């Protein structure tokens, strides 16, 4: 049996029988040369399974659809709950070289129910959440990954409000029926003490008071609980006597209640836009009712106002006037008024307008004790799509500059790129350029949310995240040490003229609202050359400069359209090039042909967008140098670009789509190659397909409507082949590009997908083709777009033989061998297609700088073909020692810098040639090729397949990359079924296979990307970026939310005030609510659910030796300090008592012998 297993393992990880090549991975030209066997290579692989572990590190961006807000005033940690059940907690990070960027932590309720309310156990490292499924959860924050310790599910009542007094172990829970229950925080079990609604109100009252909307204990007496009902009824309940002290019946509905710190009065906000003040001495009627924004009309009545949803009533020592802060309350006189937050301080009223509706707000105060002067210093305002903190200590109420990246979603994110271990000087340069455009007027004080600690370990190399957006903007983010700070913003739309009303039709057929949406990004950090692919089938090349420049942008236009026969047979006509017009190769842009040049007004040889053709002043930063656009051909818009690669050392740019491939020399501004995929094969086409020219008119194919209308579950789709589809006789070969497929929609965004408009006479569907550029013109539901893949509808291997179109799915420039007979590596372009074919195109590039600017670059397709299963996704190159071979690059130089005669500006190139020190393989190197189905390692130049591994049979790979981890190299793959797989190189031995996501959606598939150092990221919601690590070493860099901090002591009230005006009675909640006196609650009322993180959380909390010692030390210090203070107070009282006794004795002796009439 063991021998049989070894044979099976050898079939997947061993080299082929014929080391010189096989029909599946051989070449059509050249003579096979001897290739080493895997044993002869003897590459020592250091990576083991123990080096890998999947772990979420940090989530950036604004929480999607926020619902609740909470703050711990001692730990200074902020928490935001969302509609999807997520919790974002915001600790803070401080680095001397990074300033104080924000870091946040994310946790998720497994039920996915919306978070209605949150309560911190102040300075205890715990959080209570109330969810829409009527469940309470207790979260432990005393560990690196917050976990649920207990849950309590209410079965018969719905939770509406929760209140947890400071330093109390009993939680008050109000319900929709008007009842108030009490929960023990430590055991998470209901107490038998219940305040029923019919006991809270008078017996003579016939109507139900409504749900509980407010609960709070009196600052003057903790034994009194104020209960607010929605109908306007307010009850002060005496917890000891189990009866109501007073009841208030008000005409208007109540939304919130806030106490004065002395406990003598409280304020209510109402649905008519009014604020009512109540005095505890006289509760018959409010002693003050105000309409802050209600004007008095001619008839003397107040105009109607919107409800005041929340009010906060806070006092300050420095001012006799209190702060009254509330949201809402504006009059109905103006439609479309922006949401406001009003701050009333004395007679001054300040109205702050917000960009989005207010979800919740909270006033941050200096003390956690409600019976002390509050001293408010900031207001945290949670909006639907933003997060604002207002400084209350300054008269103009400025806002704080937010260290968290809340504007990731300023425009919907359409693509992402992640670069680790960047050049160290790139981040300061980008920051210095971007800092010039930052807003001013922020508060000068430090950000008030300053809790938590975070460690970054030894890996603090520079990291940059680049996001592309639907409006054509590009954002560069500093992602060093799991932070995210905005560095620089680039607007690609400035390259083009604003389209006129009559010219909108050119891009309207391609995209409805966002003609500048970014599909793909290619960046060379060393040379700082940046390329952007837009949805309107255009590529923009940028160079970085620290100086202003006045330049004219060069524009190149390509006719990359081709039509082929539906069914190809060997008896068809000869190959005919589909680019008969040589003008497509002209280095100068062609003038757009007017639409009236044909009787049918067919658009031809015009781009979707018009590039500015005048002198443009460009500020420092990235400056556009070249624009490459694909043209309309015979009334058909260009196919969108599916892949892109640039190489700064070669000065070349390559792009591909569903029709073919183009290579551009951006130094000489010329087009070197513009061919269909079939023309690249020449006579080496393994399927013997033929092109057809001239193009024929396309007919409507109604049978394709089921491609997008039917929502098919992902589980069914995973069992079908993604490599071929048969729909009405046409073949579709999907790919897994990160960019959106087709011209039908712009991906990503809270508003859902944007659909295309069809021009007159256009068929509802184009011919079936590769999914890299599949066009869908019928409406697709947002759920289908985000949560399912429209992949194969049938499985047939023979359909490949009938494939009529082949998309270029990946490109990469490298120093490699274009032919088997080559003895030295030369510049090559590796091309991968949707049929699993790999073409190697050698190039001849002049080495002298002057010749490079003048002599042409020769590109000669040789017909070299390698084959894999599924669309080709990624290339990687290793030397014979197993080390990664990086692509050559040009060192950055500022082309617009002032001329320096001592330092002539010459191109400085850095080459990484394959190592030839290994005698086992001579001068060759290894090529790693990964497709949707399998991965292969070829030895070059013999093109022998040394290793092959079938990655998946039931699903397909969405994203793959060759990355460096722990000073070694591996192949990382992300599959459509949510699995993350790691394979060793070059042996392709599986090291990790984890089901990370149970169900993936198109947003994740479009934005998921790996990078070096064992990290990856994806867009987990329209507004959030999730970063993960698959490295064990990186998993240890998580921070801690809870830090041991001494709880501030209550203020000393003074001897006389405490003796005469204080609360003489002590309130023991344990005695009142405990099982001994209150009994047990009904089991059918709520169900206790032990949390999975209970035992693990206790172990993790107990396992932190340093934290335990620190807590023990603080506890000892607190105990010793309190004992010392007690001793001092005792001595002081004894001294005072002796003094009092002495004075009393002297007074007695003096007055003893006096008569009564002598006094």
From Swiss-Prot:
Gene Ontology terms describing biological process: exocytosis; Golgi to plasma membrane transport; protein transport
Membrane-topology descriptor: Peripheral membrane protein
Region (Disordered): 1-37, 571-604, 690-770
Gene Ontology cellular-component annotations: cytoplasm; plasma membrane; SNARE complex
Bias-annotated ranges (Low complexity): 25-37
Keyword match Lipid metabolism: no
Ranges of Polar residues composition bias in the record: 699-713, 721-739
Main location: cytoplasm
Compartmental location: Cytoplasm; Cell membrane; Membrane
Record keywords, A-Z: Cell membrane, Coiled coil, Cytoplasm, Exocytosis, Membrane, Protein transport, Repeat, Transport, WD repeat
A GO molecular-function descriptor: myosin II binding
Family named by the database record: Belongs to the WD repeat L(2)GL family.
Entry protein name: Syntaxin-binding protein 5-like
Organism the protein comes from: Danio rerio (Zebrafish)
């Amino acid at each position: 049996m063991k021998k049989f297993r070894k044979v099976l393992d050898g079939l997947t990880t061993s080299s082929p029988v014929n080391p010189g090549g096989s029909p599946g991975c051989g070449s059509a030209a050249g003579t096979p040369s001897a290739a080493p066997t895997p044993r002869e290579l003897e590459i020592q692989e250091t990576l083991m399974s123990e080096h890998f572990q999947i772990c979420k590190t940090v989530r950036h961006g604004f929480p999607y659809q926020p619902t609740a807000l909470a703050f711990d005033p001692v730990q200074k940690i902020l928490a935001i709950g969302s509609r999807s059940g997520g919790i974002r907690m915001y600790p803070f990070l401080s680095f001397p070289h990074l300033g104080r960027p924000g870091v946040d932590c994310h946790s998720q309720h497994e039920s996915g129910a919306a978070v209605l309310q949150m309560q911190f156990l102040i300075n205890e490292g715990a959080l209570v959440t109330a969810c829409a499924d009527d469940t309470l959860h207790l979260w432990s924050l005393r560990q690196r990954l917050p976990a649920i310790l207990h849950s309590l599910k209410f079965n018969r009542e719905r939770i509406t409000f929760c209140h947890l007094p400071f330093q109390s172990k009993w939680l008050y829970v109000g319900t929709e029926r008007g009842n108030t229950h009490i929960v023990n925080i430590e055991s998470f079990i209901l107490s038998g003490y219940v305040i029923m609604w019919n006991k809270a109100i008078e017996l003579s009252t016939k109507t139900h008071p409504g749900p509980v909307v407010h609960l709070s204990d009196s600052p003057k007496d903790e034994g009194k609980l104020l209960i607010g009902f929605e109908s306007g009824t307010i009850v002060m309940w005496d917890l000891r006597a189990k009866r109501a002290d007073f009841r208030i019946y008000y005409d208007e509905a109540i939304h919130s209640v806030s106490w004065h710190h002395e406990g003598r009065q409280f304020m209510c906000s109402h649905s008519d836009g009014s604020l009512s003040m109540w005095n505890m001495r006289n509760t018959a009627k409010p002693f003050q009712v105000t309409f802050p924004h209600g004007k008095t009309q001619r008839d003397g009545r107040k105009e109607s106002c919107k409800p005041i949803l929340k009010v906060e009533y806070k006092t300050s020592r420095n001012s006799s006037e209190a702060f009254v802060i509330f949201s809402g309350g504006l009059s109905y006189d103006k439609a479309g008024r922006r949401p406001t937050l009003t701050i009333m301080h004395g007679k001054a009223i300040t109205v702050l307008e917000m960009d989005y509706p207010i979800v919740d707000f909270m006033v941050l105060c200096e003390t956690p004790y409600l019976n002390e002067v509050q001293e408010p210093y900031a207001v945290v305002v949670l909006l639907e799509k933003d997060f604002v903190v207002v400084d209350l200590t300054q008269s103009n109420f400025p806002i704080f500059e937010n260290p968290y990246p809340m504007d990731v979603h300023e425009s919907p994110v359409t693509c992402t790129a992640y670069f680790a271990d960047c050049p160290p000087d790139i981040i300061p340069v980008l920051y210095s350029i971007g800092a010039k455009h930052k807003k001013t007027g922020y508060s000068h004080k430090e950000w008030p949310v300053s809790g938590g600690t975070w460690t970054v370990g030894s890996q603090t190399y520079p990291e940059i995240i680049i996001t592309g957006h639907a409006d054509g903007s590009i954002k560069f983010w500093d992602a060093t040490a799991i932070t995210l700070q905005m560095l620089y913003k680039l607007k690609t739309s400035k390259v083009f003229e604003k389209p006129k009303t009559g010219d909108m039709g050119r891009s309207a057929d391609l995209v409805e609202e966002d003609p500048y949406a970014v599909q793909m990004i290619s960046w060379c950090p060393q040379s700082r050359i940046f390329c952007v692919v837009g949805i309107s089938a255009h590529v923009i090349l940028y160079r970085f400069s620290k100086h202003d420049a006045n330049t004219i942008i060069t524009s190149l236009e390509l006719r990359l359209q081709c039509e082929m026969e539906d069914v190809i047979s060997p008896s068809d006509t000869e190959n005919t090039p589909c680019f008969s017009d040589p003008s497509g190769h002209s280095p100068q842009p062609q003038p757009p042909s007017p639409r009236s040049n044909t009787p049918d007004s067919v658009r031809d040889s015009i781009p979707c967008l018009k590039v500015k053709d005048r002198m443009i002043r460009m500020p420092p930063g990235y400056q556009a140098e070249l624009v490459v656009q694909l043209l309309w051909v015979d009334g058909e818009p260009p196919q969108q670009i599916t892949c892109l690669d640039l190489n700064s050392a070669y000065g070349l740019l390559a792009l591909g789509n569903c029709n073919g491939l183009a290579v551009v020399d951006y130094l000489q501004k010329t087009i070197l190659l513009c061919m269909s995929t079939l023309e690249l094969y020449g006579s080496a086409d393994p399927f013997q397909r033929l092109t057809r020219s001239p193009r024929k008119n396309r007919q409507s194919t109604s049978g394709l409507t089921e491609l997008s209308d039917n929502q098919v579950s992902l589980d069914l789709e995973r069992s079908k082949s993604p490599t071929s589809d048969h729909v009405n006789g046409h073949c579709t070969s999907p790919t897994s590009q990160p960019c959106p497929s087709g011209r039908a929609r712009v991906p990503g965004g809270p508003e859902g997908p944007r659909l295309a408009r069809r021009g007159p006479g256009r068929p509802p569907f184009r011919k079936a083709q590769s999914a890299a550029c599949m066009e869908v013109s019928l409406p697709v539901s947002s759920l289908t777009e985000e949560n399912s893949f429209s992949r194969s509808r049938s499985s047939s291997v023979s359909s490949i033989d009938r494939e009529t179109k082949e998309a270029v799915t990946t490109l990469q420039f490298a120093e490699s061998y274009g032919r088997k007979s080559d003895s030295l590596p030369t510049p090559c372009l590796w091309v991968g297609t949707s049929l699993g074919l790999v073409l190697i195109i050698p190039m001849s590039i002049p080495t002298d700088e002057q010749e490079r600017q003048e002599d042409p670059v020769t590109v000669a397709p040789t017909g070299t073909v390698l084959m894999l299963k599924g669309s080709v996704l990624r290339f990687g190159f290793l030397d014979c020692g197993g080390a990664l071979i990086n692509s050559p690059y040009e060192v950055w130089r500022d082309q617009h810098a002032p001329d320096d005669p001592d330092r002539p500006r010459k191109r400085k190139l850095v080459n990484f040639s394959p190592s030839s020190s290994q005698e086992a393989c001579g001068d060759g190197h290894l090529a790693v090729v990964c497709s949707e189905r399998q991965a292969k390692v070829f030895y070059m130049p013999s093109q022998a397949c040394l290793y092959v591994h079938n990655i998946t049979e039931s699903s397909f790979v969405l994203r793959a990359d060759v990355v460096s981890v722990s000073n070694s190299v591996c192949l990382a793959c992300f599959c459509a079924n949510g699995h993350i797989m790691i394979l060793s190189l070059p042996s392709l031995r599986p090291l990790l296979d984890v089901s990370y996501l149970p169900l993936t959606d198109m947003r994740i598939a479009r934005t998921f990307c790996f990078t070096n150092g064992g990290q990856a990221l994806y867009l987990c919601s329209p507004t959030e970026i999730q970063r993960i690590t698959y490295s064990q070493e990186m998993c240890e860099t998580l921070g801690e939310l809870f830090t041991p901090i001494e709880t501030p002591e209550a203020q000393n009230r003074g001897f006389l005030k405490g003796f005469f005006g204080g609360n003489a009675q002590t309130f023991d909640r344990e005695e009142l609510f405990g099982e001994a006196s209150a009994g047990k609650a009904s089991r059918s009322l709520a169900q206790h659910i032990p949390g999975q993180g209970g035992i693990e959380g206790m172990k993790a909390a107990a396992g932190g030796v340093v934290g335990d010692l620190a807590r023990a030390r603080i506890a000892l210090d607190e105990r010793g300090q309190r004992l010392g203070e007690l001793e001092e107070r005792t001595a002081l009282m004894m001294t005072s008592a002796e003094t009092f006794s002495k004075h009393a004795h002297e007074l007695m002796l003096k007055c003893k012998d006096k008569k009564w009439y002598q006094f």
